[in-house]
């Protein structure tokens, strides 16, 4: 008879990973990041448990996109006021808030609901190469 192993949330303390986004493709990086956050590569993967993996992405300002998406891809946000729609291109948003692009891409891939919001809090994105998480000794994640 097969036995299903059910992992409790308290057991795993999670791992810290670091990813260098220099010259990485936006979609591929976001996809691998989301899979690691969800815990798909964990031997005890369960879709309803937060594996508590924390990912630090550095050099988010050096991410690349293929084709003409730098000028043709749009990001929308609305203030809630009448006529409050703001449209920015990839290039404009990258110059203003470079980490926001990766955050939006990963958030769109993560599951929708309470667990997805909890997983998104485990993503830390920084534009430069420095970050305040050196004390956690993050493991380099090669893609």
Curated annotation (Swiss-Prot):
GO MF term set: mRNA binding; structural constituent of ribosome
Keyword Ribosomal protein assigned: yes
Principal location class: plastid
Hydrolase found in the keyword field: no
Localization: Plastid, Chloroplast
One BP term from GO: translation
Pfam families reported for this sequence: Ribosomal_L13
CDD domains noted in UniProt: Ribosomal_L13
Assigned protein family: Belongs to the universal ribosomal protein uL13 family.
Protein name per Swiss-Prot or TrEMBL: Large ribosomal subunit protein uL13c
